[in-house]
Amino acid sequence: MSHWFFIINPTAGHRNGLRVWKSIQKELIKRKVEHRSFLTEHPGHAEVLARQISTIQEYKLKRLIVIGGDGTMHEVVNGLKDVDDIELSFVPAGAYNDFSRGFSIKKIDLIQEIKKVKRPLTRTFHLGSVNFLQDKSQILYFMNHIGIGFDAYVNKKAMEFPLRRVFLFLRLRFLVYPLSHLHASATFKPFTLACTTEDETREFHDVWFAVVSNHPFYGGGMKAAPLANPREKTFDIVIVENQPFLKKYWLLCLMAFGKHTKMDGVTMFKAKDITFYTKDKIPFHADGEIMGTTPFRLASSPSPLRIKT
């Protein structure tokens, strides 16, 4: 068995990442699998580690296993974006795990491979790339989705929450997001969004949020784009506009089951290349991580990423 490298986020999923790693490490030692492991110490560290690992005797680096949440995997693919011959594996240990849902990845897959109970399959899919129009040299990649508008605004408010450190110290992290959501609901203003695709430019008014999805799942399992397929080189775009306050929450309830697609004010279409423009700078996130503001362009990655499951 070839040399394996691990990047582990020990704090993912309320320290579930560390527990998962210890169980895997036990099997690796038992089966005498040659490996090296690296634990992240702060946000952004997984990207740095991935970039550093890719320079360590590249002939050895054929397999990289990531243990953590969607944010950890997001950092790693951005650290390895110039390396085409590496096979990635993912062991879900986070809170949302949309990536593992979208690709039917289970925690037990790697353990079964180590025990030689299961023979792994290698699948390919195309990442999405974000090009910032203000700085065309800056490019980032995403695996799951892009969110523009309200949900990104909530995430931003959660990061800026005035008493965030106090709540974390008191182990009241679970209250930060709901309180930020309430504040965002009272202060967020819908916006006008222009979308330019390969064929046309469309304009949407009174927009609450827009989602660009690489697979069906969003926000911890909601089926925002039920027909999205990560093996296609197209994105599924969902735009929600003209929603009264209460109806917006009913829409989110239906979205949990993928039943929102025919509601008034919901527009869905596919595109390979799309640029978003707004009059004001509207925040957006990639895979749940706040990345910047509009305008920006999305396209499919030129070469596919290989995932071993």
Curated annotation (Swiss-Prot):
The active site is at residue 289. Residues 1-134 form the DAGKc domain. One of its GO terms (biological process) is phospholipid biosynthetic process. The keyword Transferase applies. Keywords: ATP-binding, Kinase, Lipid biosynthesis, Lipid metabolism, Magnesium, Metal-binding, Nucleotide-binding, Phospholipid biosynthesis, Phospholipid metabolism, Transferase. Mg(2+) binds at residues 229, 232, 234. SUPFAM superfamilies: NAD kinase/diacylglycerol kinase-like. Binds 1 Mg(2+) ion per subunit. This ion appears to have a structural role and is required for catalytic activity. Its cofactor is Mg(2+). Its EC number is 2.7.1.-. GO terms for molecular function: ATP binding; ATP-dependent diacylglycerol kinase activity; metal ion binding. It is an enzyme of class 2 (transferase). PANTHER family: LIPID KINASE YEGS, SPHINGOSINE KINASE. Belongs to the diacylglycerol/lipid kinase family. May catalyze the ATP-dependent phosphorylation of lipids other than diacylglycerol (DAG). In fact, is not able to exhibit diacylglycerol kinase activity in vitro. This is Putative lipid kinase YtlR. It comes from Bacillus subtilis (strain 168). The lineage of its organism: Bacteria, Bacillati, Bacillota, Bacilli, Bacillales.
